Amino acid sequence: MENKAILETERLILRPWNIDDTPFLFKYASDPDVGPRAGWPPHNSLEESRQLIETIFNNDTTWAMVLKDVGEPVGCIGYLRHNNANIPIGEEEAEVGYWVGRPFWNNGLCSEALSCLVEYCFNTMGIKCLWGDCFTDNPSSARVMTKCGFTNCHIERKCESLIVGKDKPVMLFKLENKNNIIMNELIACCGLNCEKCDARMATINNDEELRKKTAKFWGELNNCEISPD
């Protein structure tokens, strides 16, 4: 089990779903224009929403998107590990997914939530690469990912595991953990790959710290100068 976290942004609190959220989930997930865009059918009853909270949403990688101004869940965000992702990915990678109720479309909430999730996945969970996908006729979802730094892989494929739209192509997007990229490049360049290196590099949590520590660390080991700029 992964450590379940409560995350917070300027306008949102990302927290676990609970049974009391059932009416809010049903209110937005029953909209026929919401679920099919993300590959799942509209909810047909409060009982269906309740069961999904108790089963599908009852894990350590799914969060309710609670809008602070209204104090209720207005959407959902999370990630899937390689063993249950909709697309083939590596063991140290994950697939992100998100949706928000129609009254809150075009307000930047999904981008705000995804940006927070990316930081959590990379800096706390140590995930090396994040993948995202959306139907080719859903440019709004594509914009969310590109706004958060994801790159369009220009690859289209079908996701047989989807409940709705398994016969439709999806576009793939990718975002690599910068800390991991630079660490691997430095190790490959200098030919060093030891426990000491891994322990020192594992303390890096952001780009500025990364530049400073790599410059100092690798300069010490190799008697050379590496500019932090």
Please describe what each predicted stretch is:
Residues 1-33, 66-182:
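Acyl-donor (CoA/ACP) binding surface of acyl/acetyltransferases
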Residues 33-54:
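Conserved GNAT-fold acetyl-CoA-binding loop/helix
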Residues 40-41, 88, 186:
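Short, surface-exposed helix-loop/turn micro-motifs enriched in polar/charged residues
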Residues 41-48, 92, 113, 137, ...:
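Short, conserved alpha-helical segments within structured domains
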Residues 53-64:
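A short helix-loop-beta-strand connector motif used in the catalytic cores of GNAT acetyltransferases and
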Residues 184-229:
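Hydrophobic scaffolds flanking metal-cofactor catalytic centers in soluble metalloenzymes
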